[in-house]
Amino acid sequence: MLLVEDEPVLLSALKKFFTREGFDVDCARELEEAEALIATTCYAVVIADLRLSGTYAVEGLAILRFVRSYSPATRSIILTAHTAPGIQRSARALGAEAFLPKPTPLSEIAATIHRVMAVAS
């Protein structure tokens, strides 16, 4: 699993939780770092924040495009505080299989991952 999140406290909490759940977890805090990892590692799932730079840029959509190009079998989930309907439609059109608002309970994120992975098999 690859977690892409710019907030260090949230990234650490997510990594700890999913490691305890039995996932192998890599982390990235920036778009370029995420792209480098996706280009060199085969992930079952990528969970990405929509906005990474603290600006209005939507790097999460670029990550979805990159996953689609480099690793089409990888499942993608967006976890974000920015949940406008237009953004959700764009994310789904680029391959996001789930769009979760922040905050979402960790157990619900885990259930979403398992659901997405079950559909993939």
Which residues are covered by each model-predicted region?
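Short amphipathic alpha-helix used as the core "switch/output" element in two-component signaling
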Residues: 36, 58-73
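The C-terminal output helix
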Residues: 114-121
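C-terminal output helix
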Residues: 86, 104-114
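Conserved acidic carboxylate
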Residues: 5
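Acidic, metal-coordinating helix/loop segments flanking the phosphotransfer/catalytic sites
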Residues: 15, 27-45, 53, 69
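Alpha4 helix (beta4-alpha4-beta5 surface) of REC/receiver domains from two-component response regulators
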Residues: 58, 62, 83-100
